[in-house]
Amino acid sequence: MTVKTRFAPSPTGYLHVGGARTALYSWLYAKNQGGEFVLRIEDTDLERNSQEAVDAILEGMEWLGLEWNEGPYFQTQRFDRYNEMVDKLLEEDKAYKCYASKELLDEVRAEQEANKEMPRYDANHPKIKAANEAAKDGEPCVIRFRNPKEGSVVFDDQIRGRIEISNTQMDDLIIRRTDGSPTYNFCVVVDDWDMGITHVVRGEDHINNTPRQINIYEALGAPVPTFAHCAMILGDDGAKLSKRHGAVSVMQYRDMGYLPAALNNYLVRLGWSHGDQEIFTQEEMINLFSLNAVSKSASAFNTDKLQWLNNHYIKNSDPAYVAEHLQWHLDQQKLDVTNGPAITEVIKLVGERCNTLVELAEQIGYFYEDFAEFEAGAAKKHLRGVAKEPLELALAKAEALTEWTTANIKDGVIAAVCEELEIGMGKIGMPLRVAVTGGGQSPSVDAVMELIGKERCVARIKMALEFIAEREANA
């Protein structure tokens, strides 16, 4: 048997982190088993669906790198197939027409609540029975599935263990509306059957749907897939994760500067573990993942831990991979990195100081763009008269360097200035940093100067000396 899993979101909004984790688990299980992963868009809610939401889901999946083998399939393109199966159940008396109006059903429900009974559809209720018997062919009706009245539905959930639900707890659900459109629970079953889905990985909010769907599988003579229901994700306050906890959309995390590898690593650990290991390559995730190692308890989303992971991936990933995802942020800042050092070299130097790609993009402008003025605080503190002589000597030695390397800048410029003027490193290091970067924070100034380049460094040191001269003249 070829394992086949699916991710089946509804296009009523963005791809949120809970859905992304479900997709990741489903994708990983298929990969682990040498199987296939299907993407299906469950768009039967015609009033709430939007193309914008479809695009957001596809964009999120592609950004996370969760490639699908089949799809995306759209349920709205399969209505003929669903109706064919509804008619099959009608012919076999496994479904029936119901003519009870919404008003009548509300009235019956109110009676049940008044009698302290569980509100539910009851085909044998005198009022409902009378409505169905009095109806004439051609009148608007829904089609209901004839749920078994005896026995139980039992299934072995791969995460939660054995689950048993009595058929007496389930009523006859609607499988086709009065407008002829099929309903969610029915479409899902037909889709999973037609697409050969063997394992259904989804959120625990679907547990109540599962016994109903199993009864429909069996009524159709379809194989019942194996189910795995993931626990919910909570915010750090213990409440269900929502917009009030901050970002919940996958693409919001892209916008905030997270790498997809970091988010995937974080999401896989929100419920699944392999010993004490925290960091997993994609290959390790695929090789080690199993559904029975997923916790049935809810997990709390911790942004600090995600940020720590993101910093790890920025520092330790192939700089070309980081550069690929950094480009979007550079575009947002309109920073052209073609006029300067290789972006991969800048990432290697600056990346370890950054928790997000937003921070990284904000910190590297001076490698590529000249600045008209220095940061006020840094200039006030470090570009003073006392820095004039060290910077003048540094300028002369920089201009004299024939090989512009970190080692030569360190020894032939910075160390040489300290030795000749008999000053400490701080007397030249900080003024030089402000001169060449425009601010007071950067990685090692000799390495920064190598990447900025000799011509730019010389011009910027001259600019700093002009700033000092003007400052002294106005003192």
From Swiss-Prot:
One of its GO terms (biological process) is glutamyl-tRNA aminoacylation. The keyword Cell membrane does not apply. GO terms for cellular component: cytosol. Its main location: cytoplasm. It comes from the Bacteria. ATP binds at residue 243. A motif ('HIGH' region) lies at residues 9-19. A motif ('KMSKS' region) lies at residues 240-244. GO terms for molecular function: ATP binding; glutamate-tRNA ligase activity; tRNA binding; zinc ion binding. It catalyses: tRNA(Glu) + L-glutamate + ATP = L-glutamyl-tRNA(Glu) + AMP + diphosphate. Pfam families: Anticodon_2, tRNA-synt_1c. InterPro entries: aa-tRNA-synth_I_cd-bd, aa-tRNA-synth_I_codon-bd_sub2, aa-tRNA-synth_I_CS, aa_tRNA-synth_I_cd-bd_sf, Glu-tRNA-ligase_bac/mito, Glu/Gln-tRNA-synth, Glu/Gln-tRNA-synth_Ib_cat-dom, GluQ/Sye. PROSITE patterns: AA_TRNA_LIGASE_I. Its EC number is 6.1.1.17. Keywords: Aminoacyl-tRNA synthetase, ATP-binding, Cytoplasm, Ligase, Nucleotide-binding, Protein biosynthesis. Monomer. Belongs to the class-I aminoacyl-tRNA synthetase family. Glutamate--tRNA ligase type 1 subfamily. Catalyzes the attachment of glutamate to tRNA(Glu) in a two-step reaction: glutamate is first activated by ATP to form Glu-AMP and then transferred to the acceptor end of tRNA(Glu). This is Glutamate--tRNA ligase. It comes from Vibrio campbellii (strain ATCC BAA-1116).
